[in-house]
Structures are given as C-alpha cells and as structure tokens.
Design a protein with these regions (language model features):
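Residue-level signal for cytosolic alpha-helical hairpin/rod architecture
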Residues: 51, 166-170, 241
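A hydrophobic, helix-centered structural microdomain
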Residues: 63-139, 186, 252, 257-270
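Short, glycine-rich, amphipathic interfacial segments at transmembrane boundaries or analogous
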Residues: 34, 42, 102-164, 223-241
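N-terminal hydrophobic signal-anchor/signal peptide
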Residues: 1-83
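Hydrophobic alpha-helical segments characteristic of transmembrane helices
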Residues: 24, 30-33, 181-188, 228-229
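Residue-level signature of the cytosolic catalytic core of signaling kinases
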Residues: 47, 58, 62, 162-165, ...
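A short, structured surface patch at a secondary-structure boundary
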Residues: 144-219, 258-266
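C-terminal or late-domain output modules
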Residues: 210-269
Length: 270
C-alpha cells in the first residue's frame, strides 16, 4: 500500500497504518517532511520517488519462524524441568487455602483475540474475580478496595499494593514470579510467547488509546521489556510505552537479553 498525504493529515495516516498492522501489508508513505513516531521505517525508491516503508516489526520472515521454534523448544524443556515443582506448588496452594490451584481467566492476545490464560491461584477463591470464583461479590470487594486503599497503582486497571485478598502462599508466589509457571503451557500452545507484552484483561483493553492497540500485533509474553525494566512499579502508560518500544525493535538477541535479565529481576524479588 502506498499513501501520499500532507502533514495536516498525519492523524489519518496513523489510523490507516494501525488498521493494516495485523495484515502485515507492506506500507509505504510518500513523505512531505514528516513521519510517524514510534515506528521503524526505511527509505525506499518507488519509480524515482523516495518513500518511507514503515515496518510492522523488526522481527519478520525467518526470524519470526525461529522465535516460534525457540518458544516451543524452551517451553517444552521448561515444562519437563519444572513439572515436579509445579505439582508441589499446586499441593501447597490447596493446603494453604481451599479452592483450585490454577486460576483461569480470559485475556486479550494477538489481534485482540481472547485466549485462555493460566496461572497459579494467589488469592482466596471467594475473593478472586471471575464468575466461576467469587463472582459479583468479589468484583464489588475489589472496587471498594480501590476506593479505600491509599497505595494503588494507577492505570486503565488499578492494582492494589499489599492486597488483602492475596493468600500467604500467594504472596510468596508473586514475589518469586512462580505463579506464572503454568503460562509455559500457553507458550507451547501458541497463544503466548516467552517474551512479549504483558497479557491484559478485556476490561483494560476497552480503555486503550488507539496507539496502545499496537500491543495486539504480537503474542503476549510470560516476561517482557516492561516487566524487566519496570515490573509492577510502572503505571500503565509507561508500561505500554516500553512494550511498544519492544514491538518495534524486537529481535532474537533482544529476547535472549530479556530472558537472562528476567532471572536477575526474579532473584532480587523486584
């Protein structure tokens, strides 16, 4: 697709690019001295006219295939290695508080599609949000905690520090990130990646700005650029900026760096 618009139509150009992003259509812009921010581009010659080709990602073609193969191989190895630990954690969760060991939710993944998300349950079952858990009562308790708590991480979906709904075992799992181990199965099935943006909830997504919907251009990850360099200390806007930076600059080497950095972050209990 080739688009030639003046600088006064910059918003229009942005909307076109966002709409075709998931189709991976090649996108060229014949520029009049301006370009879109936060987008990787390269100059191209089209019939002796200089145009900018906007890239959907730095990771395309064979690199994308390699990333998927990398995800399958290492998630399978990790599942085999950590399976005894996961079974032991599941037992401890059941002993610590009644209810299932696995907490299942619908999250928003690639192309904005819902997928089944797994993690170890870290809250009391009757206080966990979800129709199959605490239901409307749990949702009302969450809203009241948001209003009454003095230490809330702001964003499209606020998060409570020192959340009283979290179990004793849950606090340990969250601090060590062991609650995320079941997501290895999501990686193996292809709904998640080892590295990518944080998987968000449908109620978060409905409040996204147009630009933030770029987060749906790739699979969400167990860990990611924002998780490593900000973890839970970031508000949503800053988290989204880091994840958008990753999407535009991702590569196999950047993924490897993030994975190694994740071990350091988890070890420090950040």
């Amino acid at each position: 697709m080739v688009v030639a618009v003046g600088s006064f139509q910059k918003k229009f150009l942005q909307e076109i690019f966002e709409k075709i992003r998931f189709t991976h259509t090649r996108f060229y812009h014949i520029s009049e001295g301006f370009f879109l921010e936060d987008v990787v581009y390269t100059p191209e010659n089209i019939d002796n006219i200089v145009a900018l080709e906007y890239k959907h990602s730095m990771l395309d073609g064979r690199s994308a295939v390699f990333k998927r193969a990398f995800d399958i191989f290492f998630s399978l190895i990790a599942i085999l290695v950590f399976l005894p630990i996961m079974l032991f954690i599941a037992l401890l969760i059941r002993l610590d508080s009644p209810g299932p060991a696995i907490y299942i939710q619908k999250r928003v993944g690639k192309r904005g599609e819902l997928f089944t998300f797994w993690k170890f349950r870290s809250m009391y079952t009757h206080l966990s949000v979800g129709a199959e858990y605490g239901g409307k009562k749990a949702q009302d308790i969450y809203k009241n905690l948001i209003k009454s708590s003095s230490n809330v991480r702001q964003g499209v979906l606020p998060k409570i520090e020192n959340d009283p709904r979290v179990t004793r075992m849950g606090r340990f799992l969250r601090k060590t990130s062991l609650d995320e181990l079941p997501q290895l199965f999501c990686v193996l099935w292809g709904t998640m990646s080892l590295v990518g943006p944080r998987p968000h909830l449908p109620e978060e997504v409905k409040n996204y700005e147009h630009r933030q919907k770029r987060l749906f251009s790739i699979n969400p990850g167990i860990t990611g650029y924002a998780q490593v360099f900000g973890r839970d200390n970031l508000d949503f806007e800053d988290e989204a900026k880091l994840d958008l930076y990753y999407i535009q600059h991702r590569s196999v080497f950047l993924d490897m760096y993030i994975l190694f950095a994740t071990f350091g972050v988890v070890f420090k209990g950040k």
